Amino acid sequence: MDNLIKQLQMSVSSENVDRNFIEKCIEMNPCRRMLHEVLLERKDILRSRMNLVALYDTDEQSSEIEEILAQFENPTFPLEEVNTEKDEEWQPLERKYLDGINRIKEDTIMKQIQLDKDMEKALTNSEEVLRNHRDFRPIDEKDFSNIRQSISKRFEHSKNNIRGEAATKILVLRREIEQQGRKRRNFDKNTTDILQNWFHDHRQNPYPSDQEKAELAKQCNIKISQVNNWFGNQRIRTKQQALRMQEDERERAASMANEAQAIQNSLNSSTVASSSNMSTSGLINIPLVNPTMQSMVIPAVQPGLLGNPNAFLHQPHYFTAGGQMSLNDNGNGQQFFTDYETFGLAQSDTESFNQMGYLG
């Protein structure tokens, strides 16, 4: 066994050794079969410890990176154009951006092509190594599959790194273009004041003529195209501000109406609740008709009363006779005072009644 191990070490470490001679010696060695069985057992142990899920699992590409790399096929200028007329100052920036995108794209494609070539070379070499090892140790098809999968995964990870680097370069390029464009678009305070004063003085019709544009450009030491862009942007900003103010006013009016309705509903609920509580507690549970006063209803006038004075004496009393009602109670629980002996209009005798002069 020791002799066999030494021969294996010689075949691995030495480059000038006669390979055919070593292979023949190993094949004829009586311990070769025993070594083969030991290697198979060792191989099974190693396979049981391998994480085959991680080996065959592939890295998912980031959706954000793919969205950024879409600039390769459909590049979009970072600076938004608010006017149909393109600013002359932006044209060099746009060319710079497109050239930068093309350079990043070409560099990424070249790196991916080189990775593909290296992966094919690595796969070929690894398969050749396994075929050579087959003469000394047990090799099956699963070994070829595992090594191909391992190499492919490593190179796929490298490709994802290259795409991530390309996305980072695109973001840096866009940020540079945005900063340069912002510097070109921002005027100094004096230029801004001149343009804003003209816009404010002509706010009813903020559209300068060609002559006025040329004069403003001369005063501000800028180009006419920049004057056009500034007024276009200013008109849009003013319109958007007016729309926002109208929307805020509508929301404020709606909020005030809702608050007023809520207050009114609260007052109505309070009134109904108070009335319900008063009715329940008996505070307004007062009878409309006093039973004691029901006997005081004036009866209908009898026929012949007006034609015969004496007939009036025979009419029933309008009110209850004296002594039948307490002088300190009018039937409703209230105290009263009277100069008459009784509470009735009709007197107890005819002479007293005539003295009152009711009939003239």
Swiss-Prot record:
Annotation: DNA-binding region: 180-242
Signal peptide, first to last residue: none
CDD domains, A to Z: homeodomain (cd00086)
Reported consequences of knocking out the gene: RNAi mediated knockdown targeted to the intestine represses expression of vitellogenin genes.
Cellular component, GO, one term: nucleus
Keyword list, A-Z: DNA-binding, Homeobox, Nucleus, Transcription, Transcription regulation
GO biological process: dopaminergic neuron differentiation; lipid homeostasis; regulation of transcription by RNA polymerase II
Compartmental location: Nucleus
Role played: Probable transcription regulator which binds to DNA, repressing genes involved in longevity and stress, while activating genes involved in reproduction, such as the vitellogenins. Associates with homeobox unc-62 to regulate gene expression, including repression of genes involved in innate immunity. Required for intestinal expression of vitellogenin genes. Negatively modulates longevity, probably independently of effects on vitellogenesis. Involved in lipid homeostasis, contributing to the reallocation of intestinal lipids to the germline and to the formation of the cuticle.
Subunit: Forms a heterodimer with homeobox unc-62. Interacts with pqm-1.
Name of this chain's protein: Homeobox protein ceh-60
Species annotation: Caenorhabditis elegans
